[in-house]
Amino acid sequence: MNPLVFTMIMSTVMLGTAIVATSSHWLMAWIGFEMNMLAVIPILMKKYNPRSMEASTKYFLTQATASMLLMLAVTMNLVYSGQWSITKPLNPTASTIMTLAMAMKLGLSPFHFWVPEVTQGISLPSGLILLTWQKLAPMSILYQISPPINLDLLMMLINLSIAIGGWGGLNQTQLRKIMAYSSIAHMGWMTAILTYNPTMTLLNLMIYILLTTTTFMMFMLSSTTTTLSLSHTWNKMPLLTTAILLTMLSLGGLPPLSGFMPKWMIIQELTKNNSVIMPTTMAVMALLNLYFYMRLTYSTSLTMFPSTNNMKMKWQFNYTKSTTHLSPLIILSTLILPLSPMLALLE
C-alpha cells in the first residue's frame, strides 16, 4: 500500500475513534463509528487474498448491523425523550438495544462469531489493530451509558463471553484465533466491572491493550502464527520465545505477572459490592484461558516436536531485527504487579 494512502487511512481510523470518544451528540458518535469502520476495511485487506476479502466482508456486515442497531436505539430514545445528548440517561428499551449494538461491535458473546474468523483471515499487524484500537470506541460509549444498563442482560453477556473465550481457545492451533478468544474473555471481564467502577474498566482496557500489543509485536518479529511455528522458534530466538510465553501467561492472568492485577482488582471490587457468586464463577471460567496458555507454554518449552534437525540448539544466531522497542513493553507486561498499591490513588 502507498505510504501516503496508508497514512490517510490510519488518520481516519484514529479520527473516527476520537470523534466517538469525545462527542456529546449521538449523531456525531454514529458518524465517528462509520468513519472508523470504512477506514479500517482497507487495512484488513492490506494483503489482498481471498481470506482477507472474506474476513473484511464479515467485519463490514457485522459492524454495519451494529451501527443500524445503534441508530435504532438513538431514534427510539429521540422519540421518547426528544434529545440527542449522550450525557442524558437513555430510555430503558433504547439502553438495552444500545448495549447489544456495542456488544456486537466489541465481539461479546453471543455476538462473538466474527472475531476469530476475521482475526484469522488477516495479517498480524491488522489483527493487532482489530483487537486493540477497535475496542476503544465501543468501550467509550458503554462507559458513558453505564449507569442505566440492564444488569440482567449485562450478566448474561459477561458469563457467556468469559465461558466462550475459554472454551473456544482450547482446541486451537492458530495463535491468532487463540488471541481472538482471549480478547472475547477479556471483554467479558471489562464489562463485568462497568456498572460498579467504570474507572477500573479503563484500567483493565489499558492493561489488555498493553499485553496484546506486546504479544502481537513479538509474533511479528518471530513470524509466528501457529503453535507449531512457535515451538520451532526456541532454538533460533530463545530469549524472544521466553518473553512470548511469559506475556501469554500474563494474558491468562497467572500471578505474579501483570495480567493478574486487573482480575484481582475486579474480583475485589465485585465482592465489595456484595457479589460473591459472580466473581467466583468468573474466576473458575478464567482457568480455561489459563489452561490453554499453560498448555502452549508446556508444549513449546518442555517438549520437543518431531524434527529432522540433529543439533537442536543453533550455535550461531543470524537474527538481525532490532528488538530494543520491545524491552519496555515486555517489562510492563510482566512486572507491574508490585505497583498495584499505587492504584489506591485512583479512589
Swiss-Prot record:
GO terms for molecular function: NADH dehydrogenase (ubiquinone) activity. It is a multi-pass membrane protein. The chain crosses the membrane at residues 1-21, 25-45, 59-79, 111-131, 149-169, 178-198, 201-221, 237-257, 274-294, 326-346. Pfam families: NADH_dehy_S2_C (PF06444), Proton_antipo_M (PF00361). It catalyses: a ubiquinone + NADH + 5 H(+)(in) = a ubiquinol + NAD(+) + 4 H(+)(out). It is an enzyme of class 7 (translocase). It is found in: Mitochondrion inner membrane. Its EC number is 7.1.1.2. The keyword Transmembrane helix applies. The keyword Iron does not apply. It comes from the Eukaryota. Keywords: Electron transport, Membrane, Mitochondrion, Mitochondrion inner membrane, NAD, Respiratory chain, Translocase, Transmembrane, Transmembrane helix, Transport, Ubiquinone. InterPro entries: Complex_I_Subunit_2, NADH_DH_su2_C, NADH_UbQ_OxRdtase_chain2, ND/Mrp_TM. GO terms for cellular component: mitochondrial inner membrane. GO terms for biological process: mitochondrial electron transport, NADH to ubiquinone. Core subunit of respiratory chain NADH dehydrogenase (Complex I) which is composed of 45 different subunits. Interacts with TMEM242. Core subunit of the mitochondrial membrane respiratory chain NADH dehydrogenase (Complex I) which catalyzes electron transfer from NADH through the respiratory chain, using ubiquinone as an electron acceptor. Essential for the catalytic activity and assembly of complex I. Belongs to the complex I subunit 2 family. This is NADH-ubiquinone oxidoreductase chain 2. The gene is MT-ND2.
